Amino acid sequence: MKQDKTFSAILKNNLQSSFTHAITYVVAILFELFISINFYIRKGFFLGNGTSDLLLFFSAVPYISIIIVPSICYKFESSLYDNFVPLKSFKIVFSHYLSNLIVFSIFIIFLIPCALFINFFGSIDIGQLFIGIFFLFLYGSCIISICSFFNEIFTSPIVSFIVSALVLAIFNCAHLFVVYFSFSNIISNFIKYISFAWHFDAASKGIFDTRDFIYFIATSFIFLFLSVIVVELKKGRIFSKKQKTSIILIFGISILILLNGNSYYKRFDFSKNKTFSISKYTKKLSENITDSFKITYYRSSSLSRLYPQIRDIQDFLQIYSSLNKNISFLIKDPDKDSSLSQVLENYGITSQQMRTIDNNSTQYLNVYSSIILEYQGNFTAIPFTMDVETLEYDLDIKLSQMIFNKNLVVNILCGNGMNFYEDYNYVIPWLNSQGFICNLLDLQNSNFINNLNKSSGTLLIFGDSEINIENAIAIENYILSDKGNAFLCLNPYSVKIDTDWSITQNQKTNLIEMVENWGIHFEEKIIADPSCAKITLYSQEESDNPFSQNSTYTKVLNYPLWASLMPQEYAKSGVTTFWAVPISINDDSSSLVKPILITSSQSYNYDIDKNNPSSLIQTNPFELAKINTSNKQKSTQIVGVELSGKLEGLYNYGSTSSAKIFIISDQYFVNSLMTGYIGGDFGDYRNFDFMIDELLYLSENEDLMSIHSKNNFDKTLYKITDEYTFVKYEIITLVSLIFIFPILIICLGVSLWIRKKIKLTHI
């Protein structure tokens, strides 16, 4: 009982020393400012490059901790009297460790509101946030125990601070050594295993991995145990042979637990969309495997040493293979067996190059991360994968095709005079990567109509300005003959996207007239929305001084004619549209017409000016910024619709009762040039995800669509509605994090210091 009271008194004294010492508040402010500035300013959060992915947020914590944690663990004057305290060495060490961990935990808690500010602009994954925070506590426990160990070894606080910081720097950056230096596999695996960043990778994605949990707990215990031994030795204690045996045994068991944490493990997926978990559809699909299904993962060891997410792929494949006794899983390393490279080449798989730097020289390694699937004598491949975000979909679609011998076919046509090799050059590779077989239809081919009649499957059309009446008749006949559903991207206007963005009226609108016959109408307006994409403009000012460099200026403008649609039922991540036209629905339509894409409630229109046929509306971003839109009527508007049920022909006498057609009023939404404009540093491919989801839906593969769309968690800043609101929340965020939070920390420190002084005056 007396020992417990003494322990509580020491713990309380340590906490009082920490919370009344200026260094604690200095490092607290430094910690919070570094994380905030790194994420919100250095990463360009407010400059069009922002993302709500907390992976970037957490990544800065280990680096600032190199200085912060040794500062927290710095020995104050009161620690000099520890040897005179009637308390066991373990409790003395543990009291210092626990008080430091409490201080660090408070620092970590300060990060929660810092992360929640992201919700002003986009959606954060709460599971990712709290699993990340929990593992930061474990990480703090681990590095504090290391600092405690060096505090006991070195008498000088300055020396222990420097050594602790150096050791933490090594542990935090260990995984980078294998990037810049060449090591054997054993040494590389060891370096990877001791890396803190490597063990935090899963947690930063919202996964509770018992291997990482055991690593942090076991490492904390080992260094605390060593600290106690050091304290006992410094007191002059001589251990008996039995005690030495016990110490060696405890230390050995701890090391074995640490090293064997990888043997038996569990992973719990707390991410919002359960990206790293097997879905019900996959479990049901696996029940159809009646023969041997082999999964062979060709993974270069040089690649797995460098990227922790490669471990996720192996784990997911192991879970996948456990679904059915007929599934077998094997890993092969092309780095160890050079003949495997030839095997992969026979499958049409080539290596990917990876750059490494060794002894001031740059080398390029050929690496593989490929999956070969074999079922009933048939083979298919996933050529290269680096994460599990789309792995379940990739496996399911290939397994489904092998079991049911049914391919996904999409017939694609550029009806606006553009082509798939320059203007839509991402479309075919993207479709192929998602398991679709593309059948290109060419209007310039004299056999276009015959080729269309021979085809079957979903029809994907971009624009109709070059589609003549004969071609329109053939397309309508294709739809009415139930050969396949259709995804029509139509707009009665064309834009000179590669020059001045001027808008002109199309001379041919045969498909427009066809779909208007089915109960929808394209209005003579262009949609504008304050919730829109941003354009980054660059200008260079030449200097008069020949010895100075020219100045480059960057300006980011909201461009309301590129409406950014928020996530909705048919677009899980949202969509960016380019010069879209509002669609209205006729009440007397015989088919079922349902809106699938709508704008924000603040969207408005620019009316078409037919008196200026060369430029029907103003499209210059600088001129648009000057226009006062306060008097324009604001409302949600329809950009896309689904037609289903009965359809009757405009050009043909035929009809169908089971149509399923998607129509959006934007022919450029997957155009290569437009994708480049909105891509930013991280790439914005939401439009392509939307395209794949709808093609899967139209191909009667709604289960696969649900697998594909579950990974489409929108990490963009889609909640922004207008520039004024964006700037307002930007100011609130920066003022709160850079000024208000530090001031609150200072006020807390001053109040505790005053309280201590008052207390001392009454003694």
Describe these PLM feature segments.
Residues 1-25:
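Aromatic- and glycine-rich beta-strand/loop motifs that create alpha-glucan
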Residues 36-40, 94-158:
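Secretory targeting signals
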Residues 4, 42-46, 51, 160-235, ...:
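Terminal transmembrane helical anchor/hairpin motif
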Residues 197, 237-294, 401-407, 521, ...:
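Extracellular ligand-binding/catalytic regions of CAZymes and related secreted enzymes
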